[in-house]
A protein has these predicted regions:
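Conserved catalytic core of sirtuin-type NAD+-dependent deacylases
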Residues: 1-252
Length: 252
């Protein structure tokens, strides 16, 4: 049996990479959960309230504007790049991310191998007709008018992220579950594994006997499970990129 992360990566050919906010904190984007996470100090706006009340829509857009202005220029880091190197080696079955920051795409992860299970903040989406577009114009409208931007059809525009109380997209879940059923290694990176149903995706593979590796500095909801093969509490940026480079024998 492999003894360390490098050996697990080197011996696998269909890796399911499941990522959470911890992979983007080195890029300056704060985590939502865990110690000091956004949801420890801020109450989220639920989707039903967004659709029902203008005050909730304004609160939501104000929060998203603050995030956009503070973190909209964030760039991928060595963790995102290491995942791209894994893909280029032909070892990635799917990258399933809970993150909405778009950094996997920016790093070069292929669209066909990426599931943004909680949506993306890189686009806005009409809640009536489903039209999607880049968000800059909507942020300018909100800054100027102080109210929720509208689509040409009259529907409410909202960043294309999945809000609390909003259903995940069935196609995204199906792609993620399909990869979990066919992979030969699960890497859970930077996630507290506390949000359902997304946290069930790596467990589908683990319960079928696929090796399950978790790397996260904080505790996760899966730490106690017998299916966990390797658990590392190290900083991701310190251990994951070097392990990938060694497994793939990349030049420094």
């Amino acid at each position: 049996m492999p003894k360390n992360l490098t050996e697990w990566i080197r011996g696998s050919s269909r890796i399911l990479v499941f990522t959470g906010a911890g992979i983007s904190t080195p890029s300056g984007i704060p985590a939502f959960r865990g110690a000091g996470g956004i949801w420890t100090t801020k109450k989220p706006v639920y989707y039903q309230d967004f659709m029902a009340m203008e005050s909730a829509r304004v609160e939501y857009w104000q929060y998203k504007l603050e995030l956009w202005e503070e973190h909209g220029d964030a760039r991928p880091n060595a963790i995102h790049e290491a995942i791209v190197h894994l893909e280029q080696s032909g070892r990635v079955a799917m990258v399933v991310t809970q993150n909405v920051d778009g950094l996997h795409r920016a790093a070069g992860t292929s669209e066909e191998l990426l599931v943004e299970v909680h949506g993306t903040g890189s686009l806005v989406e009409c809640q009536s007709c489903g039209h999607r577009e880049l968000p800059e114009a909507s942020f300018e409208v909100f800054k100027k008018e102080g109210k929720c931007p509208r689509c040409a059809c009259g529907g409410y525009l909202k960043p294309a992220t999945i809000s609390f109380g909003q259903s995940l997209r069935e196609d995204d879940l199906n792609r993620a579950f399909g990869a979990a059923e066919s992979c030969d290694l699960v890497l859970a990176l930077g996630s507290t594994l506390s949000v359902s149903p997304a946290n069930s995706i790596p467990m589908i593979a683990a319960r079928s006997g696929v090796p399950y590796v978790i790397i996260n500095r904080d505790e996760t909801d899966h730490d106690h499970l017998p299916q966990v093969t390797l658990r590392l509490f190290d900083n991701l940026e310190d251990v994951f990129p070097p392990a990938v480079a060694e497994a793939l024998e990349l030049a420094p």
